[in-house]
């Protein structure tokens, strides 16, 4: 059962990696300038609206396209916030259910197929009763993939954005000093680490994502426009504050430690009571 779960988790991680690679592959799909007359569903309904919104906010801030990208990034994060809140609540519920799941695993510890199937059914029933979706954690990431590709094309196909400068770099080119990619990787790690804090050991089997994602972001940031690295940095900072406000992992960790201590104390008292009972029985027999 554990091996099967590990395989599924590795498969999920591989799928996410392949998905990001697919995003990279798609980045060069079209280089035609984007306008309101651009044809095709992707260009007309995804890339052009992103380009238009970035340009509109940039004009609002005196033609500063970096500020436009920052504002649009925050707006996108606000739009997907309901999903992120649901994800955080699902993570918290999953963590609180771990003792019950452990009990089920001990109850159905046999290796035969019938028992394994029963364990799966009981686990799914437990999830349904508590409105928990184990796959919910992947949904926000999957939604952000097309947004990332749309952002890339909006930048590379809009001359005003592509040629605008921010600090020491041109938004359409990679950061020549690798500062933004490094900051993007560090904030990705911080965001992922904070999200994973307070989770149980079983959930931590997915913790390799915490280390894989920053490395991927670093390499992507080195080769892709600096505007994308800026998008990642702002998005990661937003996620950190969002997690701390909605589902504070430090508070959750303290609660879990207190619960674990209470459970240990309860077990200690039960053992003490059982030992005292056994001692009394032994004393009566000797009499």
UniProtKB/Swiss-Prot annotation:
Keyword Kinase in annotation: no
Q: Where is the signal peptide?
A: 1-26
Residue ranges crossing the lipid bilayer per the database entry = 65-85, 135-155, 178-198, 207-224, 228-250
Q: Which GO terms describe its cellular component?
A: plasma membrane
According to the Swiss-Prot or TrEMBL entry, at which residues is a lipid covalently attached (S-diacylglycerol cysteine)?
27
Q: Which InterPro entries match?
A: YidC/ALB3/OXA1/COX18, YidC/Oxa/ALB_C, YidC/YidC1/YidC2_Firmicutes, YidC_ALB_C
Q: Which GO terms describe its biological process?
A: protein insertion into membrane; protein transport
Q: Which keywords does the record carry? A: Cell membrane, Chaperone, Lipoprotein, Membrane, Palmitate, Protein transport, Signal, Transmembrane, Transmembrane helix, Transport
Could you tell me which CDD domains the record lists for this protein?
5TM_YidC_Alb3
Its placement in the membrane is given as:
Multi-pass membrane protein
Taken from the record, one Pfam family name reads 60KD_IMP
The answer to whether keyword Signal applies is yes
| Cellular localization per UniProt | Cell membrane
Q: Which GO MF terms does the UniProt record name?
A: membrane insertase activity
- HAMAP family, from UniProt? YidC_type2
Task: Name the protein family.
Answer: Belongs to the OXA1/ALB3/YidC family. Type 2 subfamily.
This molecule's function is given as: Required for the insertion and/or proper folding and/or complex formation of integral membrane proteins into the membrane. Involved in integration of membrane proteins that insert both dependently and independently of the Sec translocase complex, as well as at least some lipoproteins.
Query: Can you name this protein?
Result: Membrane protein insertase YidC 2
Please report the organism this UniProt entry assigns to the protein. Answer: Listeria innocua serovar 6a (strain ATCC BAA-680 / CLIP 11262)
